[in-house]
Structures are given as structure tokens and as C-alpha cells.
Amino acid sequence: MTLWLPTSGKIYLPPTPPVARVQNTDEYVERTDIYYHAISDRLLTVGHPYFDVRSSDGAKIEVPKVSGNQFRAFRVTFPDPNKFALGDMTIHDPERYRLVWACKGLEIGRGQPLGVGTTGHPLFNKLHDTENPTERQEGTSDDRRNVSFDPKQVQMFIIGCIPCLGEYWDKAPVCEDAGSQVGLCPPLELKNGVIEDGDMFDIGFGNINNKTLSFNRSDVSLDIVNEICKYPDFLTMSNDVYGDSCFFCARREQCYARHNFVRGGLVGDAIPDDAVQQDHKYYLPAASQTALENSTYFPTVSGSLVTSDAQLFNRPFWLKRAQGHNNGILWNNQMFVTVADNTRNTNFSISVASDGTTVNYDAKKIREFMRHVEEYQLSFILQLCRIPLEAEVLTQINAMNHGILENWQLGFVPTPDNSVHDTYRYLQSKATKCPDAVPDTQKEDPFGQYTFWNVDMSEKLSLDLDQYPLGRKFLFQSGLQRARASARVSVKRSATRKTSKTVKRRKLTS
């Protein structure tokens, strides 16, 4: 006889109501029919593609590092719409509403021609080619070679109202009972951090901290050998409860293995047959080959063809529905645009005479320099929105970011303090205690510790959308252009109808 018995495990009890719920911004943000266009200046930068060029004493950076394999993190600030002089009081009533911006569209403009830039290392850890080996090659104490290659092709941008979050692998702390770790591979852990302007992205060697995980300084190219390669943490940003770090993103990556090499040096993890006697599970030994060659294989990738048919830039993108709860609302009147693009990765070669008197070609009297340039222009379509000053709405905004209410000059009234305070006279007297420290009244920037390319749009807004390329595209695709045209239909005057009276002739009688 079969009987049903309940499980002996713990019983799940759902939480008692009410449960805190994060609302979508569309539930409490009221959108208006007022749109603004904002466009930045031409943003230019010039530098060395591989490293910072410092002065002779190393204290000053004379030429900054500007590489096509760097992230460009723009921090775009817009004017406060609550300080606008709006004549229509039905749109903005300071007693009932606060105004905010919403991003409806953007276009990331890029100048300069398409091009492929190579990177490399004059002492690259490459023992020999393993794709088509012709003979056995035993390693020596130094087998490094001068190797260059083109990196993985990357096009990517992420927009949000807080900085983009990146991830990378780094050395993890060693457990206390692990013993000596000399000569052993360190444990790894995944770390997160804000992607700043100038951070390197992955070019084919992984998103790792090369400062701590590349002891020989020869496993990767010069531009990342002393850097942390980051990759956007899309999993964390897509699961953000408020959705502020990534409204939406676009990315395109491609690569293929162009060369197959093997590292020089001792193999850290030996093949089990030779190390722990695995009874020939991995290879059969031979009398003529008593020692195995190095088995630390790796490829150098290539980004392949660069074409204008697959460009994410110089084209508009419209935000209809964001992936998170924040549907494009720019809290604190700022937007963060994180860009990665190495399809315009040409490095200039500039040659000058070392003594100024060279007539014939002599390589020893000619100095070669390298420079990389980048050109950007950012355009936005902003929609004016308003938020009602209601208790439920303000409670959620305060839980999300209390600094928003402070910028709106709103705050919760504290409970009255009835305690008696002490006030001393003669504060500078030696007989009186030291005065209390005066608190800093200047508001601290929550992102002041990070490096961004600041773009000020305070005087770049315009209501004349039809005067700008992105504005005309927005008017056309949204149907506002046809609506404006229909309102200007001219009314034709009706022509007056002429009426002629027929004169009746008198009949003559004889």
C-alpha cells in the first residue's frame, strides 16, 4: 500500500505583506511634449599608443597614453531643468513637481578613417611556432622575441546615469593554512570596479590584472603589460535593482586565432603521466624523446576585416524601453557614456632628424615617434519630465539615492532636539577648550575619485530640433515633423461667383 508522506525538510514561508517593491520610473514619472537637443564640441585627444612618455626624472607625464584599445568614459552633465524659466505653470509648479531629464536618443559620432593598429612587445614570451613546427627546439634561458599583432576587434558602448561596472580576474588572498606558495600558481578571484576613462579593454589575452599576474612582463603586449584589462560586467548591471548603470548597450566583438605559439619557461602544471604516474593516459614515451617540450600553448588573435558596413557609431539610437527599472531618467542631471572602439586604431609614424643636418638616409640619425589620435562628438535628444512630490514617490527616491532629494532642496524634517547646547566665549583663549571642528559644507562628489572625460552641456541645449542632424532624424521617426507640417496648412480664400442678369428684350409691334 502506497502512502503519501510530507517531506521532512524545512517549510518555506512567504514573506508577510507588505513587501518592498521597486517601481519602474514610468509608474511615477510624467513625461511632457517638450524635447531638447544637446550636442558637444569636437572632442580630441592625442598621445602615445603604448605608454605614458615621462620626463627624464619620471615626475611629469609629457605625453599621455592614448590608445585605441582604451575605454572612453564620458561624464556628461546637463543643466538643472528646475532652474529653467518656463512660462507655462501647468508644466512646472515648484510646489507640486520637480523636473528631470529623460534620454530619448543619442548618437556617438566618431571621426578619423577606419584603420588597424598593431601592438606587441620587443621581448615577447614566444618560444616558437606550434602550428607548423619543422624541428624540435629546446628552450634556453631567454627565448623572447620581437612580436607584434593586431588586437581583437571591439565596438561597444553603454549608457546610464551612474558609471559602468567592469570585471576582471586578480590574485586572491592565500588561506592561512596553505603553507608556502613560492613557485605555485596563485588563487584567482573575480573583482569588480568602475570602468574609468583610459582603462584598457580585453584585446585577446583575457580580462586580468597584468600587474600582479604577469611576473615576467613579457606575456602580453606593451600597452597592457602594466594595466588591468576590464570587461563590462553585464550580468551585474542587468540584474541591478534600479537599472541606473546600464539603460541599454550595443556591442560587436570579433577575432580569430592567427598564430599559435608556446610559452618559454618551465611548465607549472606538468602533464599527469610524468608528474603523478597516470599509467600512460596522456602519451606514450619513447626512447628517443626522454624530455617533453613546453605545453603552455596560446594564440595571438586578429580582429580581421574592419569595414564601414558593421559600424555602431555615427548612427542614431532611440531609447523606447530600457532593460531595467530606470527607463532613461537622468538622475542628478548627468549621463555616463562608456565607449570602446578600436576600428579607428591607426598609429601615426613620425620621423625627425636627430641632428637636423641629415641629407642622406642614415637610420642612426633618424628618430621615429608614434602617436595616436581620437575624435568624438556626442549628441542627445532629451525629454522634459516631471515628478510629483508625493510621499510614496519621495520615499522610493530617498531609498534609492538620498542625494537626489538634497539636490532638489527637499529633506525630511528631523525630530525636535530639546537638549541644551554649550556655547563658549573667547574661543581663541588658552583657558578655553579647542573649538569643535567645522564640518565641511561642500557636498562630496560620489564619483570624484574616478577619472572621466567631463563634458559640460550647460549651454548646449536647444529647442530647435530641426536645426541639427539628430534632431531632424528624431522628428522624422517620431512623426512630430508631420504633425507640425499639418498645423501649418494654409487656408485658401474662396473665389467670388459672378452672376449675370439676362436683359429681356422688348418685343416691338408694328
From Swiss-Prot:
It comes from Human papillomavirus 22. It is found in: Virion; Host nucleus. One of its GO terms (biological process) is virion attachment to host cell. The gene is L1. It holds the Pfam family Late_protein_L1. InterPro entries: Capsid_L1_Papillomavir, Capsid_L1_sf_Papillomavir, dsDNA_vir_gr_I_capsid. GO terms for molecular function: structural molecule activity. Keywords: Capsid protein, Disulfide bond, Host nucleus, Host-virus interaction, Late protein, T=7 icosahedral capsid protein, Viral attachment to host cell, Viral penetration into host cytoplasm, Virion, Virus endocytosis by host, Virus entry into host cell. The keyword Disulfide bond applies. Forms an icosahedral capsid with a T=7 symmetry and a 50 nm diameter. The capsid is composed of 72 pentamers linked to each other by disulfide bonds and associated with L2 proteins. Binds to heparan sulfate proteoglycans on cell surface of basal layer keratinocytes to provide initial virion attachment. This binding mediates a conformational change in the virus capsid that facilitates efficient infection. The virion enters the host cell via endocytosis. During virus trafficking, L1 protein dissociates from the viral DNA and the genomic DNA is released to the host nucleus. This is Major capsid protein L1. Self-assembles into homopentamers. The capsid has an icosahedral symmetry and consists of 72 capsomers, with each capsomer being a pentamer of L1. Interacts with the minor capsid protein L2; this interaction is necessary for viral genome encapsidation. Interacts with protein E2; this interaction enhances E2-dependent replication and transcription activation.
